[in-house]
UniProtKB/Swiss-Prot annotation:
It catalyses: peroxynitrite = nitrate. A motif (GXWXGXG) lies at residues 17-23. Pathway: Nitrogen metabolism. NCBIfam families: PeroxynitIsom (NF045819). The keyword Heme applies. GO terms for molecular function: heme binding; metal ion binding; peroxynitrite isomerase activity. This is Peroxynitrite isomerase 2. Homodimer.
């Protein structure tokens, strides 16, 4: 654990670093797709982790999505995720985390979604993360454009050294 990591984040120290891997997406309104992803968790000694994510198409490397924000720990076992998307969406997700041995599981769902006038309608989001050593797995559920909350993304990433 980094010596300057805020003590409230000690349980989430295994998230720190850069993770890369591959994922797949689906939704009733689009064709299924595969993507390559890079996620970085960093810190500045305050009680939050900075989060940055970007994806590109697995087939041709074209940029797909990005998001940036902060993962906060307001109290042990609780999480708050604050994110901004360049597509005109902001989200606040609230949830919990559990640490069992070397395994961390986090579950969150939206309590607030902000949309710019030109953003596509998104009504609900949820995320599940599992960190097991140097492997990070996640899934994202989304309710958008008239569709109910359902599976949208899943990926497996590996820590880069």
């Amino acid at each position: 654990m980094p010596t300057d990591l805020h003590p409230d984040l000690a349980a989430l120290a295994p998230l720190l670093g850069t993770w890369t891997g591959r994922g797949s997406g689906k939704y009733p309104t689009i064709q299924p797709f595969d993507y390559l992803e890079e996620v970085t968790f960093s810190h500045v000694g305050k009680p939050f982790l900075a989060y940055a994510q970007k994806t590109r198409a697995a087939a041709d490397g074209k940029p797909l999505h990005a998001e940036t924000g902060y993962l906060r720990v307001p109290q042990p076992g609780r999480l708050e995720l604050v994110l901004a998307h360049p597509s005109g969406i902001t989200e606040i997700e609230v949830g919990s985390y559990a640490v069992t041995g070397g395994l961390i599981e986090m579950r969150m769902s939206t309590t607030s979604i902000g949309l710019t006038p030109t953003a596509k309608e998104v009504t609900a989001l949820g995320r599940w993360f599992r960190i097991d050593g140097d492997k990070l797995s996640y899934s994202v559920q989304m309710g958008a454009v008239g569709q109910p909350l359902q599976d949208h993304l899943a990926a497996v990433l590996h820590r880069q050294r």
